[in-house]
Amino acid sequence: MEIASKYNPAEVEGKWYQYWLDNGFFKSKPDGREPYTIVIPPPNVTGVLHMGHMLNNTIQDILVRRARMMGKNACWVPGTDHASIATEAKVVNRLAGQGIKKTDLTRDEFLRHAWEWKEEHGGIILKQLRKLGASCDWDRTAFTMDEKRSESVIKVFVDLYKKGLIYRGVRMVNWDPKALTALSDEEVIYKEEHSKLYYLRYKIVGEEGYAVVATTRPETIMGDTAMCINPNDPKNQHLRGKKVIVPLVGREIPVIEDDYVDIEFGTGCLKVTPAHDVNDYMLGEKYNLPSIDIFNDNGTLSEAAGLYVGMDRFDVRKQIEEDLRNAGLLEKVEAYENKVGFSERTNVPIEPKLSMQWFLKMEHLAQIALEPVMKDDIKFYPPKFKNTYRHWMENIKDWCISRQLWWGHRIPAYFLPEGGYVVAETEEKALELAKEKCGNPNLTMSDLRQDEDVLDTWFSSWLWPISLFDGINNPDNEEINYYYPTSDLVTGPDIIFFWVARMIMAGYEYRGKMPFKSVYFTGIVRDKLGRKMSKSLGNSPDPLQLIEQYGADGVRMGLMLAAPAGNDIPFDDALCEQGRNFNNKIWNAFRLVKGWTVDDTIAQPEASAIAVKWFKMQLDKTIAEVDDSFSKYRLSEAMMAVYKLFWDEFSSWYLEMVKPGYQQPIDKATYEATLGFFDALLRLLHPFMPFITEELWQALEPRKEGESLMVAQMPEIAVIDSAYLDAFEIVKEIVGGVRTIRLQKNIPNKDALELQIVGEHNEAFNAVIAKMCNLSSISKVEEKAAGAVSFLVRTTEYAVPLGNLINVEEELAKLQEELKYQKGFLASVMKKLGNENFVSKAPAKVIEMEKKKQADAESKIKSIEESIAALTK
């Protein structure tokens, strides 16, 4: 196979990806091997590839490819999430562009448009993942609203309802006025906002005075049904048992007492608006207060408000400030910073709202799912996220699972003509239950009305590791029994509650065991300034453009260079460039080796025999390090170990030791050993850099059709002779010392040198030292030659006689000039350090730096003086 002079990723990547697909290397079926299973965190069907996906899927692919090469039956299941809120918003926007409102359509008509949109745009991200090299079993591609997944979701809802864990009721929920749906607590992001604190006057009934309330939300006073004071607050005792009048509204409301009220906040008086504040709602329940819902679903004021009807809540805030001021009912306004809840999906401030919703009781499920993580039955990498998990599990609230949308799994509850409802998996079963419940055998489906709401998107994805293998509908099928529990989950810590915790709950509830054995938490990809990458900041590169520019292997490596588990990733294009440079290094090394002429008749040189023995041990040592790093999920460390092995040990040392002289042949034994090493290196690198390694492995020797590095065996650990490796490190220091002398004295590499040794020395490596340094002789001496330049390695002195290789007078002049400069520099540093004023005022770091300059200068002066002494002997 001909190897091009330059590596061209564009030519190589598509060719080998298609080859892998054609040969079915990504496919998996249950067999006798140990399974290795990963389920993809399903990206939104609306999505396109971003840097977070790139990182997450690179890590998954590394794990899957390595498992495959370890002889396991690797199964990586891809899929997408229907993403109710995000997808519905996209469809609504597209319809708006055509002049169609959602309200103009029936549910079925809207869903037809949604499915059309999904068919057009859904799956784009999965196609893009192929460019990255993702080795998923594409035949298994799933969608959270496909038939099997939908059946699973409905079945689980009915089951949990029958168990008494799902209930329906009016509760305070987080309402998204833009998406027009309830949200779970986890879908609310709290941000620090620059707000105002308004001090409002409430007239005390039957008195001249006012009670003053401080609030950030004057627009909600139309929903006030009480004022509350702390019974232990001396400054508000005069309000006990009184009534006050809501400003502008004119409604009399009672003053109630509860120690919930913070005496230190504002005036110590609290306005109670049970329909629009979580804490006020609890007070309302406790004191049986009426609730007045003054907001429409879209955040405008409703008829119940009586004032400002139809106006947006934030417009009302501005208007009511003016109206209160004009009425003399606004005492003052202060600047105030507070945390405001925003919808994670639409980024608008949420509205606490009383609403009839469906909820899932979480306490029972959380208790079961906490212990396995805390006892490390399910391992978290890094383990710091165990505390985050525990805190959430111990403070869990019921999960609001209903959403006021049309795109999603419709709740299988059917309302009866006379009130009440039944819950069933199908319309037929619902009708049977309805007839029984109503005692009316003549009921038809037209008499029943299915709940309009759909389930929270996470209610389908929490079943993902089970439903992908149809384990809900067919709990004893071959695939679920073979592939479950899955092996590793790779995900971001931002969805530890949304998804990870809930999957663990579902796993124990429906399989009686963990859904995965380990969770690898990736970090957040940030830019060079430490900002999270986002469209709005314009700081996120297009991953496909990066692949085009640097090649998929270059980008994969760039990501992994910066990606230790659980730490944020400071991403820079320069990392991809480093990855591309490594590709070129591998390519050029391969071309060098394959360009050698082999001569079967020549014996293996001693230096080459030593090099082969040494590199075999170096390789075995790295294999052990890589295995250890993978066992601890330190993938970046594993990659760096192979990177250094190839770049430093193989390219800079081994190839230099064995390469033949210019236009000279190489012996067969060394050549075959070198090809064997290259083969092992390509195997180690393949999970990280699949494309270039496959291209070179195929060119390493003739291959049969259907052979692939993808399914080749990973190199195994062997016994390592650490003493031999340690001894070779001394060789490196000796070679480095001689090369430094060449550099300092401008002696060309073609000029052979002598090496004299004073002290202990292991002669076993002399052949390597002679070759690497171009030495004419290596000899042990009692005393080095006059004019020789020397260096120490451990306690042994190595000297290079310079003889006629340099002009002694010129060299002495240069050294004297350098000595003069260094002494002058040292004097200036000492003057500074001797200045008490400087020493007393300068920061400790500056003093430390000056002392380092002193030590460096003294060291250089000593070295120069020794060199002068050697030349003048």
Swiss-Prot record:
Single GO term (MF): valine-tRNA ligase activity
| Binding positions for ATP per the UniProt entry | K535
Q: Which domain of life is it from?
A: Bacteria
Q: Which reaction does it catalyse?
A: tRNA(Val) + L-valine + ATP = L-valyl-tRNA(Val) + AMP + diphosphate
This enzyme's EC code(s)? 6.1.1.9
To which protein family does this belong? Belongs to the class-I aminoacyl-tRNA synthetase family. ValS type 1 subfamily.
Name of the protein: Valine--tRNA ligase
